[in-house]
């Protein structure tokens, strides 16, 4: 059965970019609920012994929305927490920076595309930096959808569900995304 991962930082460590209250609710309540629901859905089923990625792929193919949504949200949040750190942002490791320049034509173009993906995601969802074959791509997805089901490998994800930012930013999703990008991303992990 799946468990809530321990964060690599305290709930107050990302403040003021992401407040302690937001992190308490987001990690301790929302993420925990996805895990609890997932465990209840898969208990005693053929899914119970599968890896999280296999559950996502199988439930997506079989149109098992309850299992898929909760499994995918658990996976998405696991990545989201790892992609952030206190005093993040800053310098990108040269290997990743070179790949970004190669695939996007420059780091600022990538930044703009990533933030735009999150801003233009209608309703709840995610924006992603993923590997598609050997190329970095920015995508967005509605609700719990994950690039894994499209044969991509996500390496950076930003949650744009309102529970991610509303307490701190109200309806200012662009400001949340800019701060996430410039001040929270753990580029060493993304690399």
Pin down the residues of each PLM region.
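Feature for soluble, non-membrane regions of globular proteins
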Residues: 1-191
């Amino acid at each position: 059965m799946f468990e809530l991962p321990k964060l690599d930082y305290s709930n107050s460590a990302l403040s003021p970019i992401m407040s302690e209250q937001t992190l308490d609710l987001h990690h301790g309540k929302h993420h925990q609920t996805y895990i609890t629901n997932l465990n209840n859905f898969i208990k005693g089923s053929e899914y119970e012994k599968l890896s999280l990625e296999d559950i996502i792929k199988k439930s997506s193919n079989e149109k098992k929305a309850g299992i898929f949504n909760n499994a995918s949200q658990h996976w998405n949040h696991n990545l989201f927490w790892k992609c952030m750190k206190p005093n993040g942002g800053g310098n990108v490791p040269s290997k990743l920076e070179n790949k970004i320049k190669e695939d996007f034509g420059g780091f600022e173009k990538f930044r703009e595309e990533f933030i735009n993906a999150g801003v233009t995601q209608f309703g709840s969802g995610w924006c992603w930096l993923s590997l598609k074959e050997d190329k970095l791509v920015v995508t967005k997805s509605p609700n719990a959808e994950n690039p894994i089901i499209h044969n991509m490998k996500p390496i950076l994800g930003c949650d744009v569900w309102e529970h991610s930012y509303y307490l701190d930013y109200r309806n200012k999703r662009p400001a949340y995304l800019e701060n996430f990008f410039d001040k929270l991303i753990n580029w060493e992990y993304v690399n």
